[in-house]
């Protein structure tokens, strides 16, 4: 059952790609499609001034984002639960 669902989904994806390729008049279609699929630079978020969960930090400095605190034991930002 799972294999047939996977094959059906793969077939639909293949049909979509072939349909898009036939409508495209560009000769560089395969390269362009692959570059769009694997372009991760577009999804990088803006750099922030504070460090988020799991980022390394120096205890005593206020480097972590709000609601996070630098763990003196592990030296990374974790959720601050208060006292």
From Swiss-Prot:
The modification Leucine amide is found at residue 81. InterPro entries: Huwentoxin-1 (IPR011696), Huwentoxin_CS1 (IPR013140). Its main location: secreted. Residues 1-21 form the signal peptide. It comes from the Eukaryota. Residues 22-48 form a propeptide. Expressed by the venom gland. Transmembrane segments: none annotated. SUPFAM superfamilies: omega toxin-like. Selective antagonist of neuronal tetrodotoxin (TTX)-sensitive voltage-gated sodium channels (IC(50)=1270 nM on Nav1.1/SCN1A, 270 nM on Nav1.2/SCN2A, 491 nM on Nav1.3/SCN3A and 232 nM on Nav1.7/SCN9A). This toxin suppress Nav1.7 current amplitude without significantly altering the activation, inactivation, and repriming kinetics. Short extreme depolarizations partially activate the toxin-bound channel, indicating voltage-dependent inhibition of this toxin. This toxin increases the deactivation of the Nav1.7 current after extreme depolarizations. The presence of a 'disulfide through disulfide knot' structurally defines this protein as a knottin. Monomer. This is Hainantoxin-III 12. It comes from Cyriopagopus hainanus (Chinese bird spider). The lineage of its organism: Eukaryota, Metazoa, Ecdysozoa, Arthropoda, Chelicerata.
């Amino acid at each position: 059952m799972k294999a047939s669902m996977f094959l059906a989904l793969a077939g639909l994806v293949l049909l979509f790609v072939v349909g898009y390729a036939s409508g495209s008049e560009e000769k560089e279609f395969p390269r362009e499609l692959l570059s769009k699929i694997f372009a991760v630079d577009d999804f990088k978020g803006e750099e922030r001034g504070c460090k988020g969960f799991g980022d390394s930090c120096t205890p005593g400095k206020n480097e972590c984002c709000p609601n996070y605190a630098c763990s003196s034991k592990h030296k990374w930002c974790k959720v601050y639960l208060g006292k």
